[in-house]
Amino acid sequence: RDIGYWRDKQGHEIDFVINQKGRPLLAIECKWADKDFDPANAKVFLKHYNKAQVYVVSHNVSRPYSRRYDDFTIKFINLAGIENICKFQWGQNTQLLKNLKELPGKH
């Protein structure tokens, strides 16, 4: 499993990309507010990795929801939603989950 970021030569970027063998890539964009999300970078990313799942994480998302843009869908979640994705992808005892739980502040 690898955790990194993605950026192309034109400056499009994705905050976090999680790659696990045998699973679709997970692309995660972090935004202060979900209304601040611009799908342009995700659109370019998905042209290269069309099987990827893209999530926007924002503190103001009270319930997960999806939004359709052109020919792709983005899922909007809060920080607890990341924990749920990690549990689904890798089980309870992952280093990413441990790191998330060690972050200062409320979870």
Question: Each predicted region: which residue ranges?
Answer:
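A cross-kingdom feature that marks ATP-driven nucleic-acid transaction machinery
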Residues: 1-107
